[in-house]
């Protein structure tokens, strides 16, 4: 074979080149032996003795089958990749490799890493590599030379020559030491691979990992030793196991050790120069012609004649035999401990990597595979040892003598002894790292967590036990602790024997504990650790829902199989209610920490948070005395629960309610904003859709136009004819609509004429009533004269006649009410019928309008704009309101009729009683109503809450006129007529007595309201309240602007002018009316109620009388008779009233003397009529007096009704209403046009 020939040529060249250096090599060998026997060498190079071709019987197919067999149960992509790397790097030319099923993934990764530049191993010195740091990856420049074609086989051996020391042991010794393993340091090889265990068998590596160099020397990789740093402080002198024979041979082998060191330095320099040259060239150089040991062996062969060398060998043989026998026994005991040290180094190297990923994990499945592989290795070694022996003997016969073999065996035995001493040192170091306390008891674990949190004091050097590895998904973000301390840390559950809580261990602390105990796994094997805590901090978590413990430094004590008192453990906070109250008070602005030592928490938290001085509070200091409680209760802030000062803003008892309310408000605002945004988006979408539709319509129109242009002229003429016909039809339709509109207008005009006629009738009736009143007044004056003379005679007659007349009047009233009710029902039916006909007409008109609009849009005709038709569409809603109002009026009328009958009977009884008590001569207490004669002696304090005006019924009308006006008002209400034509409601600014609020302030508060003690007169509204009728002010109800109202606005203005003329005519006789007031105020009850009321206005600026607010037409004719307020003079009220009464008597007597002279004597028939009228007047006076007596005192005073014109303010109001109606019409019309346009 070609490889054998090459190896033989290389051997011959080595022999010729190295004859001159025999003497030097002998000295170096002696130094090597001394160094090896002493065991003080730290690092040794690989010594390659022999390489033989042992791989002739194996093929590539067997290699693949063995690989598939060994890794059939694993589906790991990284492992398959490593296999491919190893196959690419191991070149097979003529000889075939046999990689059996015992190959492990880390071994393949080793080969893959060796393929890099410089032998594949990092060039950093081993002394600088710490056991807890992985070396840096290879440089990018070196990766360019990793092609397998440019990597001959010798480079693999050269790389081992620079880093490892591989020696041979005889097959006999190897058979006894199948189970021994070497301590393999993987810190030099961890470039890209992640693996756990690197135990390589002494004999397994010789059979599994085989490579062929150019020289055909057989090699067996018996042992691979770890390279240790020079300064190894962990090795103790007591733990080193040295044989007895070793101490004797130290003095003899010192010279030999020096020679070995010198040879080693030369070999290292050679390998370094070779690797540098390889990097420069870009591919691997061939290996040296012969290894170092071959040179030495050939030099020894030439110097066999010297006796000094033979004497040294004999002494070494005797010493080594004794050492080997003892070392064999020690190796078997130590082999088990070697695994522990290798696992420690692995975990030291991989600890940071695993903690940074997920805080540790379980890799227990790999251990079973490793054990199965060890059994396969042992079985395979037995079969391959025979092959090694055969090839070894062939090499002896061909190239070496028996003497040379003996020398090599002795040297290798010496190296084995040195290996045994180094392994014992490493195992002793591992035992020293396990700081177990055999005297530890379970009673030593005492509870301390709860007391420390409640007292805020941390004890020194407490003991805890790890219960569980607490995998928190969320980040550990605590207040105060720096990220460097906890970002790579992990959390555990820790107990003190009674309570448990969360503890945070940095990676450095957890790694030290794992190394000290010697476990093979990272975090999950820490369950059961008993630790003495040396530095720690107790603090609240980021959510302030519990406490946590940060451990800065700890010491391993012991480990138990199960946690102590595991089933009875409780959480710290759940075990005590006091601690719950403490954590509730904590927040980001208020918290505290406790640490041991006390200054240790200042590293993470501010000083004001930690109790570094150990201040403690006693029970006496927490007691509050009664004096202090009283002083606190007396404070306004304490009682009112006001906010404290800014200094105490962040106190302990502050709650987060405000913060929650703010959050709710923010959420609500966000929701509103989202809704608004959604609405805006919807509007935008609608607008876009509309725009798209318009665009489509425009496009369609354009297309239609284009099509029309393309049409023939004949078709165009036909279309024009059709359009002309359509135009004619539309004109006919318009004419028909115009005729309908004219008819509708005619109907409207007829309806307005009917309304005018009804109003004229009402006015005629009113004028007749006014004439009758004038006649009745003249008759009254004549009758009063006769009554003064014939009272005594006529009293008895009057009483009898009054009874008959009262019955007749009641019958007449009932008949009138029936007639009025029938008339009202008939008018309502007519009104409903007219409305129904109008609605039908409106619906027909709408349909016609729609048809016209459609035709106008199609033909491009002008739009129709009819004001009258539009008015009909607007007023439909108002008509519905008027119908509801008419229903309400019917209900009120039915109630008033039922109640008036019951009350009329009661009033008739009261009249009889009061007529007996009447005295016509008691005129002393009468009071004139003119303000000029009212005394000004009343105090201003009695006038608070009252308002006065110069418009009062009593000042201008007699009681008889008031009664007649009220009766007419009732009749008109029952008949459904408008009561606002003759009687107008005064505004609240003009009403005199008993209003509840001022003009400026419209607030109806109870403080500003005033209830009068009495009333001088009773209005019609009060009588309705007493009689059961509705107290609703129909004038205050908003007027419905029906179609008739719009048409009759101008007619109402004409009616107002007629009213003004009537008022002027009626006000001519005002003087005579005022003179007759005293004759009508004869009852004592009326006088009593009149005295209690105040009649003088206030002197404030609000209540001054302005003539501008009065009716202008009335005072234009009677400016002389306008009453004016007099200045107040301090006089007693009683004397002033008497003087006023005496003056009134004098005026009445003078008027009575003048009247009979002017009036002629009337016939008897007229006298009878006058007597009947007087009786009626007396009855009316009796009813008023009875009502005054039974009138309840109400908070809201009555409104006064007087005969007058519209004031300026009322005119403004009516104009505003008209403007509003017009504006509404315009808005509706705009909307109507927009709808048509769309």
UniProtKB/Swiss-Prot annotation:
Sequence ranges of Basic residues compositional bias: 383-394
Signal peptide segment: none
Compositionally biased spans, kind Acidic residues: 362-372, 916-927, 976-990
Protein's organism: Dictyostelium discoideum
Stretches the record annotates as Disordered: 1-38, 122-156, 229-439, 660-1016, 1051-1083, 1098-1191
Low complexity: compositionally biased ranges: 10-26, 129-149, 234-276, 417-435, 678-691, 712-792, 806-859, 882-906, 1062-1083, 1108-1121, 1142-1181
PANTHER family: CYSTEINE AND GLYCINE-RICH PROTEIN 2 BINDING PROTEIN (PTHR20916), CYSTEINE-RICH PROTEIN 2-BINDING PROTEIN (PTHR20916:SF26)
Polar residues bias (residue ranges): 317-343, 929-944, 1123-1133, 1182-1191
Biased composition (Basic and acidic residues): 344-361, 395-416, 793-805, 966-975
A GO cellular component annotation in the UniProt record: CAF-1 complex
Protein name: Uncharacterized protein DDB_G0290301
GO biological process, one term: nucleosome assembly
């Amino acid at each position: 074979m070609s490889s054998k020939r090459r190896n033989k040529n290389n051997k011959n060249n080595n022999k010729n080149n190295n004859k001159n250096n025999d003497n030097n090599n002998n000295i170096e060998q002696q130094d090597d032996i001394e160094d090896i026997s002493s065991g003080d060498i730290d690092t040794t190079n690989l010594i390659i003795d022999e390489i033989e071709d042992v791989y002739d019987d194996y093929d590539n197919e067997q290699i693949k089958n063995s690989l598939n067999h060994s890794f059939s149960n694993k589906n790991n992509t990284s492992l398959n990749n490593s296999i491919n790397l190893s196959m690419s790097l191991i070149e097979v030319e003529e000889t075939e490799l046999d990689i059996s099923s015992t190959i492990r993934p880390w071994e393949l990764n080793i080969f893959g890493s060796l393929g890099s530049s410089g032998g594949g191993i990092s060039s950093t010195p081993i002394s600088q590599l710490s056991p807890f740091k992985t070396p840096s990856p290879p440089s990018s420049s070196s990766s360019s030379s990793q092609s397998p074609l440019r990597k001959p086989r010798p480079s693999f051996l050269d790389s081992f020559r620079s880093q490892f020391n591989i020696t041979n042991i005889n097959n006999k010794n190897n058979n006894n030491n199948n189970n021994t393993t070497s301590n393999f340091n993987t810190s030099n090889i961890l470039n890209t691979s992640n693996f756990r265990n690197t135990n390589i068998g002494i004999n397994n590596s010789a059979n599994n990992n085989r490579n062929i160099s150019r020289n055909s020397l057989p090699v067996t990789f018996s042992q691979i030793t770890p390279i240790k740093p020079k300064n190894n402080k962990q090795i103790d002198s007591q733990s080193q196991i040295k044989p007895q024979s070793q101490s004797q041979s130290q003095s003899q082998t010192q010279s030999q050790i020096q020679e070995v060191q010198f040879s080693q330095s030369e070999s290292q320099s050679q390998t370094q120069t070779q690797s540098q040259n390889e990097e420069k060239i870009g591919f691997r150089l061939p290996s040296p012609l012969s290894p170092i040991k071959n040179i030495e062996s050939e030099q020894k062969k030439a110097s066999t004649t010297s006796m000094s060398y033979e004497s040294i060998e004999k002494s070494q043989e005797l010493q080594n035999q004794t050492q080997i026998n003892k070392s064999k026994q020690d190796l078997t005991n130590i082999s088990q401990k070697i695994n522990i040290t290798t696992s420690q180094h692995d975990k030291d190297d991989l600890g940071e990597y695993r903690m940074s990923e997920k805080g540790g994990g379980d890799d227990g499945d790999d251990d079973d595979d490793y054990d199965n592989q060890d059994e396969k290795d042992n079985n395979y070694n037995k079969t391959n040892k025979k092959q090694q022996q055969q090839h070894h003997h062939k090499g002896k016969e061909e190239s070496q003598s028996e003497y040379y073999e003996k020398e090599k065996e002795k040297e290798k035995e010496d190296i084995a002894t040195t290996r045994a001493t180094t392994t014992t040192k490493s195992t002793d170091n591992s035992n020293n790292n396990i700081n177990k306390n055999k005297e530890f008891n379970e009673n030593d674990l005492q509870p301390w967590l709860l007391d420390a949190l409640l007292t805020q004091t941390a004890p020194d050097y407490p003991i805890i036990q790890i219960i569980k590895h607490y995998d928190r998904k969320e980040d550990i973000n605590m207040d105060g602790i720096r990220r460097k301390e906890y970002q790579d840390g992990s959390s555990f559950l820790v107990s003190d024997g009674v309570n448990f809580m969360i503890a945070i261990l940095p990676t450095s602390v957890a790694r030290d504990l794992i190394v000290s105990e010697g476990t093979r796994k990272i975090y999950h094997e820490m369950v059961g650790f008993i630790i003495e805590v040396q530095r720690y901090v107790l603090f609240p978590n980021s959510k302030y829902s519990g406490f946590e413990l940060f451990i800065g430094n700890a010491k391993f004590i012991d480990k138990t199989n199960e946690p102590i008192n595991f089933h009875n453990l409780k959480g710290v906070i759940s075990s005590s209610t006091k601690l719950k109250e403490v954590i509730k008070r904590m927040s980001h602005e208020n918290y505290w920490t406790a640490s041991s030592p006390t200054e240790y928490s200042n590293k993470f938290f501010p000083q004001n948070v930690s109790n570094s001085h150990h201040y403690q509070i006693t029970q006496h200091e927490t007691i509050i005395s009664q004096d202090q409680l009283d002083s606190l209760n007396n404070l306004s802030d304490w009682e009112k629960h006001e906010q404290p000062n800014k200094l105490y803003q962040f106190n302990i008892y502050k709650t987060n309610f405000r913060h929650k309310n703010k959050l709710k408000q923010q959420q609500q605002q966000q929701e509103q904003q989202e809704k608004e945004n959604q609405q805006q988006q919807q509007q935008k979408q609608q607008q876009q859709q509309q725009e798209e539709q318009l665009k489509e319509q425009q496009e369609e129109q354009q297309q239609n136009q284009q099509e029309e242009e393309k049409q023939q002229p004949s078709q165009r003429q036909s279309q024009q004819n059709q359009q002309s016909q359509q135009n004619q039809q539309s004109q006919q339709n318009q004419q028909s609509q115009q005729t309908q509109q004219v008819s509708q207008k005619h109907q409207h005009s007829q309806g307005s004429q009917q309304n005018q006629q009804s109003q004229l009738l009402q006015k005629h009736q009113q004028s007749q009533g006014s004439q009758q009143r004038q006649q009745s007044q003249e008759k009254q004056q004549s009758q009063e004269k006769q009554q003064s003379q014939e009272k005594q005679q006529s009293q008895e007659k009057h009483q009898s006649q009054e009874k008959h007349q009262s019955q007749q009047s009641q019958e007449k009233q009932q008949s009138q009410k029936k007639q009025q009710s029938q008339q009202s029902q008939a008018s309502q039916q007519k009104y409903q019928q007219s409305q129904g006909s109008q609605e039908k007409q409106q619906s027909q008109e709408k349909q016609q309008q729609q048809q016209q609009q459609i035709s106008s849009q199609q033909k491009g005709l002008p739009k129709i704009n009819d004001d009258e038709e539009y008015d009909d569409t607007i007023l439909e809603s108002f008509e519905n309101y008027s119908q509801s109002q008419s229903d309400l009026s019917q209900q009120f009328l039915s109630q008033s009729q039922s109640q008036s009958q019951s009350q009329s009977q009661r009033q008739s009884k009261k009249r009889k009683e009061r007529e007996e008590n009447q005295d016509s001569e008691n005129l002393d207490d009468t009071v004139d109503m003119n303000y000029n004669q009212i005394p000004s002696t009343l105090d201003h304090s009695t006038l608070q809450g009252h308002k006065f005006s110069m418009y009062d019924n009593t000042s201008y009308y007699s009681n008889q006129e008031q009664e007649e006006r009220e009766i007419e008002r009732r009749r008109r209400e029952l008949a459904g007529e408008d009561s606002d034509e003759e009687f107008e409601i005064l505004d609240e600014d003009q009403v005199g007595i008993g209003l509840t609020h001022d003009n400026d302030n419209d607030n109806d508060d109870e403080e500003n309201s005033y209830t009068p003690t009495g009333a001088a007169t009773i209005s019609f509204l009060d009588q309705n309240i007493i009689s059961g009728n509705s107290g609703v002010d129909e004038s205050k109800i908003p007027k419905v602007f029906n179609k008739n109202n719009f048409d009759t606005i101008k007619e109402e203005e004409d009616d107002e002018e007629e009213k003004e003329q009537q008022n002027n005519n009626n006000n001519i006789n005002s003087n005579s009316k005022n003179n007759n007031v005293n004759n009508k105020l004869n009852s004592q009850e009326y006088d009593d109620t009149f005295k209690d009321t105040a009649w003088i206005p206030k002197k404030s600026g609000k209540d001054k009388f302005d003539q501008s607010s009065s009716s202008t037409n009335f005072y234009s004719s009677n400016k002389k008779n306008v009453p004016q307020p007099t200045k107040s003079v301090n006089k007693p009220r009683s004397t002033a009233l008497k003087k006023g009464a005496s003056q009134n008597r004098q005026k009445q007597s003078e008027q009575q003397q003048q009247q009979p002279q002017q009036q002629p004597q009337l016939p008897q028939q007229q006298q009878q009529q006058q007597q009947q009228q007087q009786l009626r007047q007396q009855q009316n006076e009796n009813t008023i007096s009875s009502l005054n007596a039974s009138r309840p005192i109400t908070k809201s005073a009555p409104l006064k009704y007087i005969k007058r014109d519209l004031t300026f303010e009322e005119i403004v109001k009516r104009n505003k209403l008209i403007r509003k109606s017009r504006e509404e019409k315009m808005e509706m019309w705009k909307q109507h046009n927009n709808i048509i346009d769309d």
